[in-house]
């Protein structure tokens, strides 16, 4: 599907939901390299680094108002991937885009269930971030 122009989006989550994508066909599609074990930063990032303010995912968002990006899955960007947001201390990616065949891929390494990212979910631009991600991978 992605190879012919579809999309793939990966979101981090609870350890019980661990994707364990390493070594699977999904691992090949993702714009990140994932570990073969559960590897997280549960401390999070106080102020994430916006690497590309002009990227369509970042467009129109008040990143200065995002004071905290909670815990995240430790991954590394795949060759040719584009890191939109990162942890300034570890330099690990938080939001990464890539391509696979004719399609687009996105990895959001944080959580969405409110545990890790309770503060991020309260960010006024959080809904728009996901609209931007959906629009990016759909185009």
Tell me the role of every PLM-derived stretch.
Residues 78-82, 89-92, 99-104, 110-139:
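Extracellular ligand-binding/catalytic regions of CAZymes and related secreted enzymes
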């Amino acid at each position: 599907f992605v190879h012919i122009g579809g999309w793939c989006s990966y979101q981090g989550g609870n350890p019980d939901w661990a994707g364990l994508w390493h070594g699977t066909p999904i691992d090949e599609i993702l714009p990140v390299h994932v570990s073969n074990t559960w590897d997280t930063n549960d401390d999070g990032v106080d102020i994430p680094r916006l690497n590309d303010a002009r990227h369509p995912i970042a467009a129109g968002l008040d990143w200065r108002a995002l004071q905290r990006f909670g815990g995240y899955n430790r991954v590394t960007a795949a060759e040719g991937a584009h890191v939109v947001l990162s942890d300034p201390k570890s330099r690990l990616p938080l939001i990464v885009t890539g391509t696979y065949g004719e399609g687009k891929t996105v990895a959001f390494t944080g959580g969405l269930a409110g545990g890790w990212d309770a503060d991020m979910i309260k960010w006024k631009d959080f809904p728009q971030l996901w609209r931007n991600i959906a629009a990016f991978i759909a185009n």
